[in-house]
């Protein structure tokens, strides 16, 4: 989206909010507040604001409202109830085609989930088409395992797609359209050094390569396939006076001599992202592109390409940044940590990858609900584990079976226990259909070390004991006696049937403990509530159960 288009939207919203008259100062303030990357282009933005305000204020109120609907904009009054769900897509004409286009540098992380889920939600809403496009045209940033990990992660997220496209299979297409672009005079082969071109670009001047004819540029293009890396690039002609130097004659093709994991050394001239993306979006019929507002400049670059080739661009929808507090998302940092042995793998609980989140028992529905709630608003949003845990807890509370788990357990023989005690507790307090579990207390019991304290204790649903000098002495059985004693409630595990268990925490530390014997029926991927400890997913079963901790 070009600056003029973005500013026009802000002016339109301001006008509708203030009886049809937009205020230049208010519009400028909104743009600078919500689009920090444009602050360094303030003079250009100010001119665009003035033009947009004049245009918007010349419209009748009903025309302004019509424009709002066309662009999919809405005004939220502070006192109004917050709108539920995603807003409608703007400019829907016929079939809606969207794409999710990750780089295969590793598995997906929770930041990718936003784009994947939002595209899927819109595809379902409009009964449209969703394309999974693997953008692997930088051989040095391709992890071969990612070709399998990405679809697997999407399946866990519940994202369904209609077609898979792998860009490295389409190299001949990119070559064809590079030639077309050169023939139309929209691109040229540049042999300037990066330093030399940077000087030309910063001064807003053309290098000598720009003025060469089509025939010579086509010859240079063919020669690029034999030239060494760094000796030549293809540049798309834009505006050399553009306020943003990054947009001036951007690179569309470059030479890369690295071996590609899928195609080997078959190709050595590769497209840059902005070129391959624009070509594919057009040829695949993509109608709407959802992307972060950090791609505003990329959208503007691609629009030059569309104009050169006589194509209609898709509708670009830019949303605000998603700030992720306390969540490790760097793919390169994670890979480095895995190689160094800091992390056990891509599903290490300290990471923010989809597979790490799934391993901890976070439900995909919780992630989907969060991303839909954040939506495509242009303002930045913040996400944290606390928010994810809250949504996930609402899901797990309804389905997780309950068990006693004693962390760092201490074994006791209860002195004076009059006889075996049989306790029957429901697997879920609100779902009797799940059945009960049986705890047989015959004298020996495990208690969690961290909950021990001198004085009266109530073994939940069982007996009252006195803990003193490292020993447990039976006192009584009734709950009324426990109240009179002001006994502290404590969960417990019968020693005779106890199973060894370990809980892997979010920081990858491990807590050893024991769990009640009925947990032997648990299977891998079951998520349970370890009462008074937290929710956890079964990672492995057998004589020693391994859980991955989710949250309280």
From Swiss-Prot:
EC id: 6.1.1.17
Keywords: Aminoacyl-tRNA synthetase, ATP-binding, Cytoplasm, Ligase, Nucleotide-binding, Protein biosynthesis
CDD domains: GluRS_non_core
GO CC list: cytosol; protein-containing complex
Organism superkingdom: Archaea
SUPFAM superfamilies reported for this sequence: Nucleotidylyl transferase, Ribosomal protein L25-like
Record's catalysed reaction(s): tRNA(Glu) + L-glutamate + ATP = L-glutamyl-tRNA(Glu) + AMP + diphosphate
Summary of the function given for this chain in its UniProt record: Catalyzes the attachment of glutamate to tRNA(Glu) in a two-step reaction: glutamate is first activated by ATP to form Glu-AMP and then transferred to the acceptor end of tRNA(Glu).
PANTHER family: GLUTAMATE--TRNA LIGASE (PTHR43097:SF5), GLUTAMINE-TRNA LIGASE (PTHR43097)
Annotated NCBIfam families: gltX_arch (TIGR00463), PRK04156.1 (NF003169)
Descriptive protein name: Glutamate--tRNA ligase
């Amino acid at each position: 989206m070009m600056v003029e288009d973005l500013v026009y939207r802000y002016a339109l919203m301001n006008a509708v909010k203030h009886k049809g008259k937009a205020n230049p100062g208010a519009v400028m303030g909104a743009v600078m507040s919500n689009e920090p990357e444009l602050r360094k282009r303030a003079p250009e933005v100010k001119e665009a604001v003035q033009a947009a305000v004049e245009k918007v204020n010349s419209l009748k109120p009903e025309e302004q409202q019509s424009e709002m609907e066309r662009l999919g904009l809405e005004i939220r009054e502070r006192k109004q109830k917050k709108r539920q769900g995603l807003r409608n897509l703007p400019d829907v004409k016929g079939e809606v085609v969207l794409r999710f286009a990750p780089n295969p540098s590793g598995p997906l992380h929770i930041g990718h989930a936003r784009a994947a889920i939002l595209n899927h939600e819109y595809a379902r809403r409009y009964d449209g088409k969703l394309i999974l496009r693997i953008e692997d045209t930088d051989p040095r940033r391709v992890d071969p395992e990612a070709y399998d990990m990405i679809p697997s992660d999407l399946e866990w997220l519940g994202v369904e797609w209609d077609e898979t496209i792998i860009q490295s299979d389409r190299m001949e297409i990119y070559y064809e359209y590079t030639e077309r672009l050169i023939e139309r005079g929209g691109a040229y082969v540049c042999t300037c050094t990066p330093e030399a071109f940077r000087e030309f670009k910063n001064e807003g001047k053309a290098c000598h390569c720009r003025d060469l004819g089509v025939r010579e540029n086509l010859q240079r293009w063919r020669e690029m396939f034999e030239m060494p890396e760094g000796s030549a690039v293809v540049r798309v002609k834009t505006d050399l006076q553009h306020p943003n130097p990054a947009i001036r004659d951007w690179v569309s093709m470059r030479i890369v001599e690295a071996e590609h994991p899928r195609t080997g050394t078959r190709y050595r001239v590769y497209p840059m992202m902005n070129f391959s993306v624009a070509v594919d979006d057009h040829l695949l019929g993509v109608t709407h592109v959802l992307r972060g507002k950090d791609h505003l400049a990329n959208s503007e670059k691609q629009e030059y390409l569309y104009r050169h080739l006589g194509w209609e661009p898709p509708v670009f929808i830019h949303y605000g940044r998603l700030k992720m507090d306390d969540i490790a998302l760097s793919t390169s940092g994670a890979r480095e940590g895995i190689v160094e042995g800091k992390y056990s793998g891509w599903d290490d609980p300290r990471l923010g990858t989809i597979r790490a989140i799934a391993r901890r028992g976070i439900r995909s529905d919780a992630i989907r609900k969060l991303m839909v709630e954040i939506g495509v608003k242009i303002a930045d949003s913040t996400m944290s584990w606390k928010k994810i845990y809250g949504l996930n807890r609402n899901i797990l509370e309804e389905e997780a079976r309950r068990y006693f788990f004693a962390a760092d357990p201490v074994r006791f023989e209860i002195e004076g226990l009059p006889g075996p005690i049989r306790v029957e507790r429901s697997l879920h307090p609100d779902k009797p259909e799940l059945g009960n579990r049986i705890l047989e207390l015959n004298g020996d019991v495990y208690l969690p070390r961290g909950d021990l304290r001198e004085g009266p204790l109530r073994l939940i649903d069982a007996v009252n004991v006195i803990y003193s000098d490292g020993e447990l002495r039976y006192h009584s059985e009734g709950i009324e006696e426990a109240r009179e004693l002001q006994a502290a409630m404590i969960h417990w595990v019968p020693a005779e049937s106890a199973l060894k268990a370990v809980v892997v925490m979010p920081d990858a530390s491990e807590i050893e403990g024991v769990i009640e014997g009925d947990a032997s029926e648990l299977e891998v991927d079951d998520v349970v509530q370890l009462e008074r400890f937290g929710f956890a997913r079964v990672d492995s079963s057998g004589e020693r159960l391994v859980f991955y901790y989710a949250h309280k």
